[in-house]
C-alpha cells in the first residue's frame, strides 16, 4: 500500500469531478484524494447538506459546469437514477458552451471521460451515449471542443472506507463497459509545451487500479445491465421483506416470523434484518432504481413491469408517507431497528390507506365499507355482513 501511494504521489494525476457528492460519491472522492487526486464538484442548487459534505471532504467546488469541462479529465456521474440524463445534459451543454467561448488551443485538447455510474437501465445508458455522440459531431470542427468519451458503469456495494488498522481500503465493485477504455497518455510539461509522454502505466490504467475496476464487456449498457439484475434481487428482496415484516408487525406476529426465518433460512434472515434498517436513507434513490429495473426487465427480457413498479411504490411510500423519509446517513434518529421501521411504516401505510379511502369514498360513498372477501364468503347465505371481531 505504501509503495503504491508513493508511486502515485510521484506522478501527475488528473482531476476527477464527482457529480454529485452523495454518500457514494463522497466516499469515492475521499478515497481518490487519499491517493493524491484532485477531486472537484459543482454544487449550484444543491442542498446545504450536500454542500457541507463536499466541503468537509475537501473537494474543490467549481462555480460552473464549464469549469469542470475546462479543468477535469474525468467526470463521475453518481446521482439518483431520475437525474442521470439531466446530469449528462448539463455536461453536454457545458461542453458546447465552453468550446464556443474558448480560444483555440495550440494542441488538440485531451478528451473528457464521462463515467455514468448510476443505477439505470441499459436503455438509459445508450440514450446518454447517443447524446454525447451528437455533441461530439457538433464540436468536431471546433478546435477548442473536447471530445467526450462515454463509459457505461455501475457500482455494487457500499462506499469506500479506509480500515485504520491495516491501511487497506474497502472498495465497492465498480463495473465498466463500452468500446472506450480509460486509456489516457500522461501529459507532462516539457520545453514550455505540453507533449505526450509514454509511461509504463497510463493515467487511465492507474485510475482503474485505484478504483478496482472490473470490465464486463465492450458494449454500452452491459455494466448497467449487471447492476439492474443484481439490484433486482437484493433491493427487490428488501422490498418484499419490508412488506412481509410490516404486515407481520400489524398482526402482532413480527417476532414469530423472525424466529421462523432464523430457524429455516438463516442466511435470508440475516440479510433482510440488516437490509431493512440500512434502507431508510436510501429509499428516495431506490424509487427510481426500481423503475429502471422495471424498464430493463421489460425492454431486455420481455417481462411485465408490474413487479418492480410495485417495489418502487414500497420505497416511495417509505420516502413520502413516513418519518423514515427524512433519515440521512450519518444523522440517523429513527428506523435503526426492524421494530421501529415496521412501526413507522405501519403508521404511514395506515395514513396512506385512509387518504386513499377518503378519495375513493368521494367517488363512491360505499367504497370504503366494502370488503370483497367478506362478500365472497357470505354470498348466497342469509347472514349479515358483519366482520368477526366487530
Set out the residue ranges of the language-model regions.
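Helical "substrate-binding/catalytic lid" subdomain
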Residues: 223-334
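Rossmann-like NAD(P)-binding element
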Residues: 59-123, 147, 173-175
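NAD(P)+-binding Rossmann beta1-loop-alpha1 motif at the extreme N-terminus of oxidoreductases
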Residues: 1-76, 97-108, 212
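Hydrophobic beta-strand scaffold residues
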Residues: 39, 61, 149-150, 255
Amino acid at each position: 500500500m505504501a509503495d503504491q501511494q508513493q508511486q502515485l504521489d510521484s506522478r501527475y494525476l488528473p482531476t476527477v469531478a464527482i457529480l454529485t457528492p452523495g454518500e457514494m460519491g463522497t466516499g469515492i472522492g475521499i478515497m481518490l484524494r487519499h491517493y493524491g487526486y484532485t477531486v472537484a464538484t459543482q454544487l449550484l442548487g444543491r442542498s446545504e447538506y450536500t454542500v457541507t459534505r463536499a466541503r468537509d471532504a475537501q473537494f474543490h467546488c467549481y462555480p460552473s459546469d464549464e469549469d469542470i469541462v475546462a479543468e477535469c479529465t474525468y467526470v463521475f456521474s453518481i446521482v439518483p437514477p431520475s437525474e442521470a440524463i439531466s446530469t449528462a445534459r448539463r455536461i453536454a451543454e457545458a461542453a458546447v458552451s465552453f468550446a464556443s467561448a474558448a480560444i483555440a488551443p495550440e494542441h488538440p485538447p485531451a478528451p473528457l471521460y464521462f463515467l455514468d455510474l448510476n443505477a439505470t437501465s441499459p436503455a438509459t445508458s445508450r440514450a446518454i451515449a447517443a447524446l454525447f455522440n451528437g455533441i461530439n459531431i457538433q464540436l468536431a470542427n471546433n478546435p477548442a471542443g473536447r471530445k467526450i468519451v462515454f463509459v457505461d458503469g455501475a457500482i455494487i456495494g457500499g462506499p469506500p472506507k479506509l480500515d485504520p488498522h491495516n491501511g487497506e481500503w474497502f472498495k465497492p465493485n465498480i463495473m465498466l463497459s463500452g468500446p472506450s477504455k480509460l486509456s489516457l497518455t500522461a501529459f507532462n510539461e516539457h520545453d514550455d509545451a505540453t507533449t505526450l509522454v509514454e509511461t509504463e502505466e497510463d493515467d487511465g490504467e492507474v485510475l482503474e487500479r485505484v478504483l478496482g475496476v472490473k470490465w464486463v464487456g465492450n458494449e454500452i449498457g452491459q455494466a448497467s445491465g449487471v447492476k439492474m439484475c443484481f439490484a433486482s434481487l437484493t433491493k427487490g428482496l428488501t422490498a418484499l421483506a419490508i412488506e412481509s415484516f410490516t404486515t407481520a408487525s400489524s398482526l402482532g406476529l413480527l417476532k414469530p416470523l423472525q424466529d421462523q426465518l432464523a430457524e429455516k433460512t438463516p442466511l435470508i434472515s440475516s440479510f433482510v434484518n440488516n437490509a431493512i434498517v440500512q434502507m431508510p436513507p436510501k429509499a428516495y434513490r431506490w424509487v427510481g432504481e426500481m423503475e429502471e429495473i422495471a424498464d430493463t426487465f421489460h425492454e431486455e427480457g420481455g417481462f411485465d413491469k408490474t413487479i418492480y413498479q410495485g417495489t418502487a411504490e414500497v420505497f416511495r411510500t417509505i420516502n413520502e408517507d413516513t418519518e423514515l423519509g427524512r433519515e440521512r446517513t450519518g444523522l440517523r434518529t429513527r428506523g435503526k431497528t426492524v421494530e421501529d421501521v415496521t412501526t413507522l411504516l405501519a403508521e404511514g401505510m395506515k395514513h396512506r390507506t385512509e387518504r386513499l379511502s377518503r378519495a375513493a369514498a368521494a367517488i363512491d360513498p360505499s367504497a370504503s365499507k366494502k370488503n370483497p372477501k367478506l362478500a365472497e364468503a357470505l354470498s348466497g347465505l342469509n347472514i349479515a355482513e358483519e366482520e368477526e371481531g366487530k
